[in-house]
């Protein structure tokens, strides 16, 4: 008997208050790593009406102006008019930073494996920056090997920002949210149930002043300029049964930090798989690569994506866990949800033998300390909005499928050996 169900994921634009914070945090990280690739960074940002607070722990040789970094990023996002209650030029910026705790630093600088002389391997020298669990996921629903709902939500959010920035819909303002509900049948997406867009806008549009008329124009414009282009090249599209909701409160004039405070790390589901896969709870933005919340989550995605890209499973989830100050993962778990072409234990063995999952190894494999300087001073800030994963518009090392062919051959060899 077939099972039909709905699954929903959301995204937000770069002008959402929480995303402003994520982008400032990651711009700080980019700037510090560009000058000093060994910087230890845990940059947290809070925004509210007319206020930016930069706090956290940073140890670095770099010399930067944190207030200028924040203002430049705020202006780039689109907050340039003080009449909106928040702008790059008018906001106050408070900087309250400490250095990384020496108790934490000693475990990261010299991992337990090295301190206790259990290993002389290079990648055993750096310990994990904290304990924790991280998940990586991939599935074959989209070319990005990501779940369809989060891909669509991101596409709409990016298009929403694009038509604002180009002036195509000049009445739009930076804050916005999107949400897509996908119809599934027997585990495969078959339709679009609901598309929801909430977008900040001016109180009037040209000579249109009536609130209902303003909302009617916004709804029509968003369908034509945003939704239709997003779905234009896709097989699954909205149909006559699809609900299209726009600003369901009736208006969205007060937005950005004037409407809601923002905080770094508060959109972790938007940053990953839209709720389709499990999440360990750790945020990404503002954290240097020794923080396994970030680097190990990228590594787990890399593992899962290569397994799916190799055709060894239709979907794959990988869990990694770490202890602070210890280089090697405490545990590695893999689940293909019954879609694997071979037993999960065979895949797990291949992962353990062929993927480098120690923090120093992940940093080296993905070049995580040097990418900001190699890419003109910006890398992490570009993934701080519209998702860290499945970004075919960016060259991200954890999105590469360079181990897929090897995995296919290894499985074939393993099966042949078992038969022999």
Swiss-Prot record:
Describe how the cofactor binds. Answer: Binds 2 divalent ions per subunit. Binds 1 potassium ion per subunit.
MF-aspect GO terms: ATP binding; magnesium ion binding; methionine adenosyltransferase activity
**SUPFAM superfamilies listed in its UniProt record:** S-adenosylmethionine synthetase (SSF55973)
Function recorded in the entry: Catalyzes the formation of S-adenosylmethionine (AdoMet) from methionine and ATP. The overall synthetic reaction is composed of two sequential steps, AdoMet formation and the subsequent tripolyphosphate hydrolysis which occurs prior to release of AdoMet from the enzyme.
User: Where, by residue number, does K(+) bind?
Assistant: 44
What is the originating organism of this protein? Trichormus variabilis (strain ATCC 29413 / PCC 7937) (Anabaena variabilis)
Cofactors required: Mg(2+); K(+)
Descriptive protein name: S-adenosylmethionine synthase
Q: In which pathway does it act?
A: Amino-acid biosynthesis; S-adenosyl-L-methionine biosynthesis; S-adenosyl-L-methionine from L-methionine: step 1/1
EC primary class: transferase
Give residues annotated as binding L-methionine.
57, 100, 260, 291
Gene3D superfamilies this protein is in?
A: 3.30.300.10
Q: Name one Pfam family in it.
A: S-AdoMet_synt_M
Chief place of localization: cytoplasm
A GO BP entry is: S-adenosylmethionine biosynthetic process
């Amino acid at each position: 008997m077939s099972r039909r169900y709905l699954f929903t994921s959301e995204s937000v634009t770069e002008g959402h208050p929480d995303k402003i914070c994520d982008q400032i945090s990651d711009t700080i990280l980019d700037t510090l790593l560009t000058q000093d690739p060994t910087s230890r960074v845990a940059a947290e940002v809070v925004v509210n009406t007319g206020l930016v607070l930069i706090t956290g722990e940073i140890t670095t040789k770099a010399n930067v102006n944190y207030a200028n970094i924040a203002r430049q990023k705020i202006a780039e996002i689109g907050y340039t008019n003080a009449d909106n209650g928040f702008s790059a030029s008018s906001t106050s910026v408070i900087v309250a930073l400490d250095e990384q705790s020496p108790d934490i630093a000693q475990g990261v600088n010299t991992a337990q494996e090295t301190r206790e002389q259990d290993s002389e391997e290079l990648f055993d020298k750096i310990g994990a920056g904290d304990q924790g669990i991280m998940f990586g996921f991939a599935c074959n629903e989209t070319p990005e090997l990501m779940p369809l709902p989060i891909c669509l939500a991101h596409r709409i959010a990016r298009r929403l920002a694009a038509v604002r920035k180009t002036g195509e819909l000049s009445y739009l303002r930076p804050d916005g949210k999107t949400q897509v509900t996908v119809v599934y049948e027997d585990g495969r997406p078959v339709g679009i149930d609901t598309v929801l867009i909430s977008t900040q806008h001016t109180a009037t549009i040209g000579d249109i002043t009536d609130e209902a008329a303003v909302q009617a124009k916004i709804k029509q414009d968003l369908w034509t300029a945003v939704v239709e282009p997003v779905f234009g090249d896709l097989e699954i599209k909205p149909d006559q049964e699809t609900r299209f909701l726009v600003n369901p409160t009736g208006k969205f004039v007060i937005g950005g930090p004037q409407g809601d405070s923002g905080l770094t790390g508060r959109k972790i589901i938007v940053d990953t798989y839209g709720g389709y896969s499990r999440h360990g709870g750790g945020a990404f933005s503002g954290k240097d690569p020794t923080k396994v919340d970030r680097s190990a989550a990228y590594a787990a995605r890399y593992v899962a994506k290569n397994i799916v890209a190799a055709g060894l499973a239709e979907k794959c989830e990988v869990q990694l866990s770490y202890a602070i100050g210890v280089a090697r993962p405490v545990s590695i778990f893999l689940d293909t949800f019954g879609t694997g072409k071979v037993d999960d234990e065979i895949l797990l063995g291949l992962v353990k033998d062929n993927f480098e999952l120690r923090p120093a190894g992940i940093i080296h494999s993905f070049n995580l300390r040097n990418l900001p300087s190699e890419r003109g001073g910006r890398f992490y800030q570009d993934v701080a909005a519209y998702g860290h994963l499945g970004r075919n518009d960016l060259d991200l090392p954890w999105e590469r499928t360079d181990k897929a062919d090897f995995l296919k051959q290894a499985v074939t060899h393993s099966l042949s050996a078992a038969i022999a």
